Amino acid sequence: MPTGKLRQKPPYAAIMTNSPVTPSTETQQPKRDALYARFLPQEADAPPVEWLIAEGLTDYEEALAFMEARVQAIREGTASELVWLVEHPPLYTAGTSANAEDLLTPDRFPVFNTGRGGEYTYHGPGQRVAYVMLDLKRRREDVRAFVASLEQWIIETLAAFNIMGERREDRVGVWVVRPEKPRLADGSMCEDKIAAIGIRLRRWVSFHGIAINVEPDLSHYGGIVPCGISEHGVTSLVDLGLPVTMGDVDVALGKAFESVFGPRQTK
């Protein structure tokens, strides 16, 4: 993993929004840990979120086209909210804040420019991607609280396997402290990223989502500077010594989702 310093990122670096968000100063914004990280529907009779698990590997361009169509249908009221769980073949994606210098080996895997927020990340077999298509108007029109809720969903999922995932105010995503690894040059504890978040909002309907490393080939991250952060590494559940399957993670994701976002409906 390349070494270096954490670059300063603009606010909402993992978010791209076409929704009318009013900017506020840093002093006005509570820390994400202080936000109420539950995004339940406001209506008591709101329909459950559709929960769909794709089989095999999903082509990335097909996934983008599917999300675009579904978001439009949710906005028009002709489709329900949806969480779609997929795995992709090996690829890199570039968010709206990506720096070309962070793509270290451009010819290693296909590279897709995407409208989500954030920088470069990797998707591939052994990583569970959850595309989250929710209507925030039915919940809360609060982007930072939504990101905190996505982090909470991941944290509660990891807790099912006795893994303590943590937020970091300067880094969106979920992190695991690695006391068994050498400390950083400044003496701080080593931390590895286990889950990434990159979302986009269109008229308050979300798409893109989260990615949790279950058992991907972590060497594939060597072709990028993940999320523009070079001083911390990446890890996975299996890398942490847990013999879990994708099915195990899907069960934990489902239970934690209901805690944070409310009822879901499986097919």
Curated annotation (Swiss-Prot):
<dbReference type="GO" id="GO:0005737">
    <property type="term" value="C:cytoplasm"/>
</dbReference>
<keyword id="KW-0012">Acyltransferase</keyword>
<feature type="binding site">
    <location>
        <begin position="196"/>
        <end position="198"/>
    </location>
    <ligand>
        <name>substrate</name>
    </ligand>
</feature>
<feature type="binding site">
    <location>
        <begin position="209"/>
        <end position="211"/>
    </location>
    <ligand>
        <name>substrate</name>
    </ligand>
</feature>
<dbReference type="InterPro" id="IPR004143">
    <property type="entry name" value="BPL_LPL_catalytic"/>
</dbReference>
<dbReference type="InterPro" id="IPR020605">
    <property type="entry name" value="Octanoyltransferase_CS"/>
</dbReference>
<feature type="active site" description="Acyl-thioester intermediate">
    <location>
        <position position="227"/>
    </location>
</feature>
<feature type="binding site">
    <location>
        <begin position="116"/>
        <end position="123"/>
    </location>
    <ligand>
        <name>substrate</name>
    </ligand>
</feature>
<keyword id="KW-0963">Cytoplasm</keyword>
<comment type="pathway">
    <text>Protein modification; protein lipoylation via endogenous pathway; protein N(6)-(lipoyl)lysine from octanoyl-[acyl-carrier-protein]: step 1/2.</text>
</comment>
<protein>
    <recommendedName>
        <fullName>Octanoyltransferase</fullName>
        <ecNumber>2.3.1.181</ecNumber>
    </recommendedName>
</protein>
<dbReference type="InterPro" id="IPR000544">
    <property type="entry name" value="Octanoyltransferase"/>
</dbReference>
<dbReference type="GO" id="GO:0036211">
    <property type="term" value="P:protein modification process"/>
</dbReference>
<dbReference type="GO" id="GO:0033819">
    <property type="term" value="F:lipoyl(octanoyl) transferase activity"/>
</dbReference>
<feature type="site" description="Lowers pKa of active site Cys">
    <location>
        <position position="193"/>
    </location>
</feature>
<comment type="function">
    <text>Catalyzes the transfer of endogenously produced octanoic acid from octanoyl-acyl-carrier-protein onto the lipoyl domains of lipoate-dependent enzymes. Lipoyl-ACP can also act as a substrate although octanoyl-ACP is likely to be the physiological substrate.</text>
</comment>
<dbReference type="Pfam" id="PF21948">
    <property type="entry name" value="LplA-B_cat"/>
</dbReference>
<feature type="domain" description="BPL/LPL catalytic">
    <location>
        <begin position="77"/>
        <end position="265"/>
    </location>
</feature>
<comment type="similarity">
    <text>Belongs to the LipB family.</text>
</comment>
<keyword id="KW-0808">Transferase</keyword>
<dbReference type="InterPro" id="IPR045864">
    <property type="entry name" value="aa-tRNA-synth_II/BPL/LPL"/>
</dbReference>
